[in-house]
């Protein structure tokens, strides 16, 4: 009854106004699943490949009609008649059909759209919410959000070199309370920025993008906002960074163009260690460049016992790169982005590998998002304990928070908010 009978796909717009792929899957019993695919601004060189049309006369070359066509024809021909409940077989069939190591022929955007829509259709056929269908009865941990309230780097037009400054409501008792706490800090920060004469326009992910001179200036504003909102920094609300260091790694050094400084690999490690010592920073993502394995190892050895070090561009949700990191003792956490690897099966495999090795996993959005809230369900399904899905503004970000609120309500007394237990390093402090 769960045989796949039809796939329809279309070109829709993401939160930046760029085209992306949306896929509908229909099963033999009439069950329906729909998924929309996100897109990143700062992308790792080792990510699976989005298929873009390259026709400069449409969407400045960013159209996705080729991926749409692939989903509706070649992929449908390959998986039509297969059981949607056999997710692994469906995903493996698409990967084999593509035949490239990075999904470049059919496009990770086509394959992922179908993969997620198949899972949603199978969940509907089983009468279960997606988080329960994917995670079983064990999926009940609501993640601590990483809320991106100041944007810099590739996500904003300002001098700040780091891409994201985030708050984590580790002291909340529930997901709903965590969202409330984050919202209160967000609005308090807005008032303080405005009072100081800064603009309060928001970046791609809903955070503010003020013209501040340095990371320290941004962190000071965030600390002030946390206190002014009535919370204790480091206790109620911890800090997290996404440096996106690959974006400013040039000629073997880290070029802080906004600050007018260049730091060697060793100086970059020392700088991040200094920030962790000065502020209640419990997580740093991409503190070193994606192929600076030596720098990553230095950073891990220096502060990995007291700070979560998240590999995004480093690992790109890829089990081969993650296995190298585990073997070398590099980083201690992986960012999970479904479109970096391009299928649900491979995404779940990366989470499983990380958790078995004692690494944490952070479920994540992309800067180019849609109203699709699948990652909220996946965060609960995998019990990963952390989610990164933007600020407390823009409906494309709030769709995920709102879905988590619904999931928490649906779980009732079974729901468990991860809190400080989500970060091993925080428990040691």
Swiss-Prot record:
User: What are the GO cellular component annotations?
Assistant: cell surface; extracellular region; phosphopyruvate hydratase complex
Where is (2R)-2-phosphoglycerate annotated to bind?
Answer: 163, 337, 366-367, 388
Kindly give the PANTHER family that the UniProt entry links to this protein. Answer: ENOLASE
Q: What InterPro entries does this protein map onto?
A: Enolase, Enolase-like_C_sf, Enolase-like_N, Enolase_C, Enolase_CS, Enolase_N
Tell me the protein's name. Answer: Enolase
Cellular compartment(s): Cytoplasm; Secreted; Cell surface
Enumerate the cofactors the protein uses.
Mg(2+)
Q: What is its EC number?
A: 4.2.1.11
* Pfam families linked: Enolase_C (PF00113), Enolase_N (PF03952)
Taxonomic lineage from the root: Bacteria, Pseudomonadati, Pseudomonadota, Alphaproteobacteria, Hyphomicrobiales
What positions does UniProt annotate as the active site of this protein? 205 (proton donor), 337 (proton acceptor)
Binding-site residues, Mg(2+): 242, 285, 312
State the superkingdom: Bacteria
Q: How is the cofactor bound?
A: Binds a second Mg(2+) ion via substrate during catalysis.
Give me the reactions it catalyses.
Answer: (2R)-2-phosphoglycerate = phosphoenolpyruvate + H2O
Q: Does the keyword Magnesium apply?
A: yes
Please tell me whether the keyword Hydrolase is annotated for this protein: no
* GO molecular-function terms, A-Z: magnesium ion binding; phosphopyruvate hydratase activity
